[in-house]
Amino acid sequence: MSQVIEPQLDRTTYYSILGLTSNATSSEVHKSYLKLARLLHPDKTKSDKSEELFKAVVHAHSILTDEDQKLRYDRDLKIKGLHTYQPKKNCHIFKTKAKESQGASPTLGQSEAYHRQNKPYEQQPYGFGVGKKMTSSSKSKVPIFKSFNLKSYQRNHYYSSKKERKHGSPDIDSLFHETNGASKVRMTDAGKMDTNSQFQEIWEILGKNVYTHKSYSEDPNSCLGSALSDHEEEEEEAGKQQQQQQQQQQQQQHYGMTSKSSSPDEEQKDNKESKRESRVSPEENGEEETGHKQFKLPKTSTFSSGSHDSNLQSPFYNHEYRHYARSKFECKNQFRKSVSPIKEIPATTSTNEGWNILRDIIEKLNISNVDDRNKDLLFRRDEIGDKNHSDSIDIENLSIKEPKGMKRRKKDDISLEELFQSLPREKDYFMMDAINDSLESINLFKKPKTTQSHEQGGTFAQAESNRAKFKPLLEQCGITPEILDLQIPEIPEFDAVADLETLKLNVQLFNNQCNKLKETIHQVSLQRLRADTQFSDMLTQKQSIMVWKTYLEFDKSLMDKLNILQERQMQVIKIFSERCDGKV
């Protein structure tokens, strides 16, 4: 059997041959060409159509890569309406078709063919080529990323080989494990194992005695022990969740109890009666009892409910909860930061006494500082008639005294008293009105100017005077920029006017507006002509060339506006003449 590719291409346009639209770039064209050329090359495929299609792909690529030919082809596509053509969806899908070779023997169907089973190496049949190659559907459905456990593999292999030797004994491993690896052992709400009829059949056939769950979990070779050990963590978590739910229910019942609560003796009697009712005699239901004993798990809870029942006033369920809360509180206090000094400290007798002592010391220090300052020679207070004077110091009444041992200043120097009088007093703003006069009165030593500086100053002043001369005003030159903002009247709509008289009136009104605008433009141009003749000597110099250019640009804009106005007048006259002749 040999496989042959059956190519299918959309040969409507060169773009559709390559599986592209007309908006495709050169890189996309090249990529699709390489892809199709690899698939349709005659050396690669044995199809009869591949050679013809390969030539078509090469021709399409040669045209679309040449810029001139591509432009012509795109123009032709727009004319034909194929510029937005999309390639067909069922094309560019290469299907493989099985081709029967001559002299081949008829083969069996897929259902009749022999499939090699997924077995270990030691269990596979001898010889090669016995079975058919595995297809994707016949492959193993075991997940690839599943973790491999060597012990479980050996245990499963041991029980399977034991089963084959006994010929008829039940496969224990297959009964205890589901197909997906999950255990058939299930937990009930009460924390006990659920039994099945399959388990009862196993124990009847094997004739084994009843063991507790502890014996199975301790035996590493037993399949039941492995199944239970695999789910110990899940069962413990389920048991913890059930205990938490029971604790919450008991707390709700405790807080919602009425005053008619039963005594502890009555509660113990009720508990004993409920336990007796829940127990079933082994004679009445022996099979259920044996099944529960076989799969009974040890209790994982270490909390006793009797302590909470005895002490209903305590918010904790038992002493272990209380111990946990106490240790958590102590740990939190241990790592707590120190109290902030900004926070208010509760007033006590000891703290008040300390603050009062500090306050008295500060007041005494302030009084001593004031006395020392009064005794100093540098500060002398003037005599005041009133004895009950305030402690506030007035700057105006103070006088500064020279210390002993200091030389007398010269008469030309400014004394401290004069300086004190000249300085601004307290709360007086410094006025800067007479600062210019004071600066002019100061005699500064000025260096005499050199000849070079005199020449530079003269040239600079001359240039400034020349600039002032060569900069006449815009009004003197006849430039009025406001005239450029004047709007030219628009051509009226004569199609809506049917009467000839009204048409004449509209034409006259338009002509009058245009004539007024022409008159203003001619006046401005006449002023410009006079200004050019007047300032001809000034404008022809080197400094005023740029100014002259701006004047000429203004004249040009005036003439452009005048030309537009005349063209509109010509259009109106043409329309009016046609209406009068009756052509329109």
From Swiss-Prot:
A Gene Ontology cellular-component term = nucleus
Q: A GO term (biological process) for this protein?
A: cellular response to misfolded protein
Q: Where is the J domain?
A: 13-77
Q: Which Gene3D superfamilies match?
A: DnaJ domain
**Among its keywords, does the record have Transport?**
no
Which residue windows does the record flag with biased composition (Polar residues)? 299-312
**Modification Phosphoserine occurs at:** 229
What SUPFAM superfamilies does the annotation carry?
Answer: Chaperone J-domain (SSF46565)
Annotated GO MF terms: Hsp70 protein binding
Region span, Disordered = 216-312
Q: Where is this protein chiefly located?
A: cytoplasm
Composition-biased stretches, type Low complexity, lie in 241-253
Keywords associated with the record: Chaperone, Cytoplasm, Nucleus, Phosphoprotein
PANTHER family, per database record: AT29763P-RELATED
This chain belongs to which protein, by name? Answer: J protein JJJ2
- Natural source organism: Saccharomyces cerevisiae (strain YJM789)
